[in-house]
Amino acid sequence: MHDVIVIGGGFAGVTAAREAALRRRSVLLLEGRERLGGRTWSGEWHGWPIEYGGAWVHWHQPHTWSELTRAGLPVEISDNAQLAGWYVGSERRSGSIDERDEIARRGWDRFVDGVAQALPAPHDPAAALGALARFDRLSIAERLGELPLSDEERDVLTAELESLAHAPLDDAGAVSVLRWHALSGYSLELTQFTGGRVTIAGGTRALLCAISAGAPFERLLGAPVSAIRHNADRVEVETRDGTVFAARAAVVAVPLNALGAIEFTPALPEDKQRAIALGQASRGIKIMIHARGEPIIQNSIRPGHPFGYLGTEALNGDGSQLMIGFGIDAQLCDAGDLTAVQRQLDAILPGYEALDATAHDWLADEHSRGTWAIHRPGWYEHHHAAMQRDEGRVVLAGSDIANGWSGFIDGAIESGLRAGARAAALVG
């Protein structure tokens, strides 16, 4: 019998395993995939290092920055775009990034009005829950509908919000974006910067390896968990092939949208079951396109497009470039259909030829069932505290239920730090 079993090998699970092992507990980590990393996944494509999932970090993210400092890992800051495109209805307009940001800022300032009072301490969403509830009850679309905006302001702001939400705006809660804004120093510019400019040299894999090397623990890949049985003394974890592992405590670091695939005995309390049934809203796509055209760093946004944000990530010496796009629904974009990708490219950033495209379908992936956490309306008022509560010897963890940077690597590390320490304490 192990002291602690950790279920899930993303950043939350690996951090929790390390923290329990540092406290001299024997730890077994079970991961359903044949790799660690969860919703981060470093790779290489056409000679470029790419991230199929989470990628960006920032010094405003304290847990991530502490781990980067500990590991001695440098970061890389991408160049800002030289040219920006945006759409008002079907009309494409272009100008400088500053010009488009000024349009976005006029709408953004109205969208976030009041958030400083609702989220005075962004790492503690319960600090002013009464004030936060007014926003928590709204979808992003409902919040947008409250605002007096010109057509241009509305379309630019809608496209910005779609790229952040990675979900249809009538399904995504306003607080997920408002929290991101608050954590970024209540600034549009920093909200954009924290989510898209700073990456880890060597990729997210380098940081994950550094954390996992921080203390010895066993790990078993390709071991999806189907059932968890727990009582006052122990936890039994059964994998899909029928193998049963036992421990004195367990950390379940599984994405919210995948938790429903695990059978708990005794059943989880009704408040947790309601939260799991609600899930989180993200269902988008992150697509990488190898394109040929004008060798300039630029991006374009268009509301309602299959990838409503598309921008240059890297230029190649042969005149080609790597573009990255984000869309609100993975089912609207098939990276394997280059003809469709070309048609969609022409409709947001014309003048480029799509040579190849790739993406991972996180929505279809049974181990994630979605991308970064974008909570639905009512999450913080009704579900957040319940999902952070222990159930006997079972501790839940993950970026989806973090207090701070939920949906980011930082939120996963935050949650893993807390869960690993808690599980070690439960062992005694």
Language model regions located:
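Central beta-strand plus flanking loop segment that forms part of the substrate or channel wall
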Residues: E270-Q298
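Flavin (primarily FAD) binding-site architecture
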Residues: V252-P269
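Active-site/ligand-binding neighborhood in enzyme catalytic cores
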Residues: D124-A223, R234, A253, E263, ...
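Core beta-strand elements of the Rossmann-like FAD/NAD(P) dinucleotide-binding domain
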Residues: H2, R240-A249
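N-terminal Rossmann-like FAD-binding beta1-loop-alpha1 element of flavoenzymes
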Residues: H2-L29
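Dinucleotide-binding Rossmann-like beta1-alpha1 core, especially the glycine-rich loop
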Residues: W48-A118
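Conserved flavin/dinucleotide-binding core of flavoenzymes
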Residues: T15, R23, R234, N299-G428
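Glycine-rich FAD pyrophosphate-binding loop
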Residues: A21-W45
